[in-house]
Structures are given as structure tokens and as C-alpha cells.
Amino acid sequence: SKNPLPTLKQMEDEPAKLLEEKANSGHAVSGKPTENQAAKSGPTNSDGELTKKIIESLCKAIIDVEPTLTKYDTVVGDGDAGETLRHCAEAVLQYLKENKIPLDRATSTVLGITEAQESSMGGTSGALYAIYLTGLVQGLLKSTQNNGEAATVKHWASAANHAFQSLGKYTPARPG
């Protein structure tokens, strides 16, 4: 039977065009928690320095794999995915260097990463990543009963599920 889910190519049609128009309008993605809300709510990072090292390691891995991502994207897309992700990773590293990403609360950390991402990625992919990361912050805020507790795998899994559901409101693309 035919798969009812859209292909990546089909994603380039109307929903992607609408997202790109919104992304290029200069407006931030709506529903983004404020810095103040994120700084006072949600789970904490149990070890800020470890969190920083993990983020740095992930960014360096993205930078290292950029040529491979670009190669694959030239086959299935327009060839800019690797460069776009590398620019984002470089922006996150710069934000870390300038202490623009708070490391005390998981929500503040993701919000700082989101700001770096929004400053470095445009177009449809930039909008989609911003929606996902904003959903991740919202999910972290919803996942905690006690604002002082450290983020656990359970918090992150719940937040990631929330982010995925948020993204699903803006794009018909689904895994598979």
C-alpha cells in the first residue's frame, strides 16, 4: 500500500514555503518562553561545566561531520544542510565562549542554544529547528514538579516528545 506520509521532496511545497516566509519575516517563533521564565523555572543542570563540555563536544562533532552531511544533502536536497548545521554549531560555540548560554538550568541552557541557532540559521530549516528547540524548553518547563530538581533522562525524554509534538503542528513530515 502507498505510504500516506509525505516525502522529503513533498515537504518543499506549501508548508515549507509558509514556514520560510515566517522565518524570513524577522519575527521570532511564537510561544517561546521568556528568558526570565526559563531562568526561574524548570529543572537544573546537575553540573554546569559538564553540560558545557557536552555541548562543545556535540558542536565539534557537527562541525567534523559537515562534509558528509553536505554530500548526502546534495543527493536528496539542495546541498546546504551541512553548512547550515556547521554555522549553527559555530554560533553555539561562540555563545558559550561569550557566556551567553546559561549553564545553571536546563531550560536556560536550551533557550541560549535556541538564541544562537536563531541568529545563525535562516530559511525553512532554521524555522523548524527553532520550533523544535522552543518546544524542548516548553517540555522541560512542563516536566518538572520541583524547580530545584536536576534534569534527568526522564525530563529530557518528556521534553523531546513535547518538542516533537510541537514540530508536528507545523509540518506534515513524520518519521518513516
Language model features by range: what are they?
Residues 1-176:
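N-terminal loops that bind phosphate or other acidic moieties
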